Amino acid sequence: LDRATQLALVAAHEAMTEAGISGKPEDAHRFGVYAGVGFGGAQTVDSLYERFYTLLHDTSQPGRNPTVMHPLSVPRMMANAPAALVSMRYGLNGPSNTYSVACASSAVALGEVFRAIRDGYLDAAVVLGTEAMLTPGALMAWNALRVMARPNVTDPARSCRPFSKDRNGFVLGEGAAAIVLESEARARARSRQALSELCGYGCS
């Protein structure tokens, strides 16, 4: 699995555990997975290019074919892989949707779940956001945009200062987060204490 998917599975596990859900829910057909993913399988893509160009120029291994890749390369790199794997892990048969809206991807995923529950299409969903782009190719691509922060040599932790007046760019990171969003009726039926309430959503 690509690292972005691995991170998503861990986050989803924590969210499901927090929500008191283990195994396949009885209402799995009304339980979806909505993911926000900006790119997806960056690690997989980078490793494919590395293998291809290494074997293409490696004269010490004349019998190795640089075009022969792992048969699951495409499913690993697809942006919908995290949502698909979480759906399969928990046997969730509701919609498995992925939104790619740059930095707003997981926020849009959350809002669309809100609408689906409000309008009666779903009762619950795992909402997740994941990204893992700490690869040579991704770092060079972001650096080419001239948006990366210049490193603070004396205190590297201060390189990322998005709200400072002397900020000079951002620091690329990786991670995943997930929550379980469900209708109030479903939460009450399970005698679960809600951690928060989502009251609205807009997107333009």
Task: Annotate each language-model stretch with its function.
Residues L1-V101, T130-L139:
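Conserved beta-ketoacyl condensing-enzyme motif
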Residues V153-S204:
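Condensing-enzyme catalytic core mediating Claisen C-C bond formation in acyl metabolism
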Residues S106:
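Short conserved active-site loop signatures built around small residues
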Residues Y121-A125:
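Short, high-confidence coil segments that cap the C-terminus of an alpha-helix
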Residues A42-E50, A132-C160, A178, G202-S204:
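Active-site-adjacent elements of ketosynthase-type condensing enzymes
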